[in-house]
């Protein structure tokens, strides 16, 4: 509960700081935050919420081998999914904002600035679900203090960076401060897992970090190539970039024998056809 309270307080602080950095900054921050939250919430609901009961079950049975496998799977799956999303937002943030809010009194300048803020929020997007999984792991192990303390540290970091970066970068600095605070919380949570090192191991996750990063490199290259080819139409370019680059990304993951991508594909098939994924 404390962690939720800290998150709400963080958002309140962001809005308060935004009111001091420029005209319309609060609205810009809210628009960008809404889009960013859509991506984060979808993943959080589909993976974290589904995994938490199983985490609790393994913890209650003290089956730490299976618990470690589940944690590694969740962390790796999150990273595989979030890598293309983050790169896509980085390259097409203005298109996303234009599709979502580009009407009425929302000007080109508003779209550009909101897109830049969205990009800086997206830098922290990759840490938000990882933090959620790590937090659920602590809760399943009966440790509620560590996530709360780390959230409080993140809040202090966020407030401090809001003041510094907000002064120099305006509303963009507030978004960057939020992303950095998410990164700090996540890194601390994963680092503090060493207290459970006799039971929980996330070495598999660390050893296989190169796979989504390698896929991300090919994804970025394909994004840039498609962006150049379809430069005559921004919206067609963004659509084709997503489809073709995602196909290349998945191909790279399959070629590197990334088992999480097979799990994700099977999971989606189960959901699509209404089958029991555990059978």
Residue ranges with predicted function:
Residues 90-124:
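Interfacial segments at transmembrane-helix termini and the short loops linking adjacent helices
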Residues 134-142, 190-207:
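Alpha-helical transmembrane segments
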Residues 145, 153-187, 226-243:
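Membrane-interface helix-loop junctions in multi-pass transport and translocation proteins
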Residues 45-63, 68-74, 134-135:
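Helix-loop junctions and terminal segments of transmembrane helices
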Residues 1-57, 219:
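Transmembrane helical elements of multi-pass membrane transporters/channels
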Residues 70-91, 103, 168, 172-197, ...:
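Short alpha-helical transmembrane segments in multi-pass integral membrane proteins
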Residues 123-153, 164, 168:
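Membrane-interface junctions at transmembrane-helix termini in multi-pass inner-membrane proteins
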Residues 224-279:
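Membrane-proximal transmembrane or re-entrant/amphipathic helices at the cytosolic face
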């Amino acid at each position: 509960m404390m962690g939720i309270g800290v998150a709400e307080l963080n958002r309140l602080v962001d809005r308060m700081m935004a009111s001091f950095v420029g005209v319309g900054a609060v609205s810009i921050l809210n628009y960008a935050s809404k889009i960013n939250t859509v991506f984060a919430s979808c993943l959080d609901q589909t993976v974290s919420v589904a995994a938490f009961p199983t985490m609790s079950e393994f913890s209650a049975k003290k089956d730490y081998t299976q618990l470690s496998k589940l944690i590694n799977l969740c962390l790796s799956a999150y990273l595989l999914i979030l890598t293309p999303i983050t790169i896509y937002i980085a390259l097409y943030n203005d298109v996303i904002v234009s599709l979502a809010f580009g009407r009425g009194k929302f000007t080109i300048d508003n779209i550009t600035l909101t897109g830049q803020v969205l990009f800086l929020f997206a830098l922290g997007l990759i840490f938000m679900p990882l933090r959620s999984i790590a937090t659920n792991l602590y809760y399943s192990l009966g440790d509620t203090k560590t996530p709360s303390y780390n959230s409080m540290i993140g809040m202090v970091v966020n407030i401090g960076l809001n003041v510094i970066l907000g002064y120099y970068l305006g509303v963009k600095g507030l978004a960057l401060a939020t992303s950095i605070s998410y990164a700090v919380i996540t890194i601390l949570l994963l680092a503090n897992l060493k207290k459970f090192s006799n039971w929980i191991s996330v070495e598999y996750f660390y050893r296989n970090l190169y796979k989504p990063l390698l896929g991300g490199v090919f994804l970025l290259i394909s994004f840039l190539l498609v962006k150049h080819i379809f430069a005559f139409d921004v919206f067609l370019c963004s659509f084709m970039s997503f489809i073709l680059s995602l196909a290349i990304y998945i191909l790279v993951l399959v070629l590197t024998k990334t088992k999480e991508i097979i799990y994700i594909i099977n999971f989606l098939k189960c959901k699509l056809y209404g089958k029991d994924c555990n059978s």
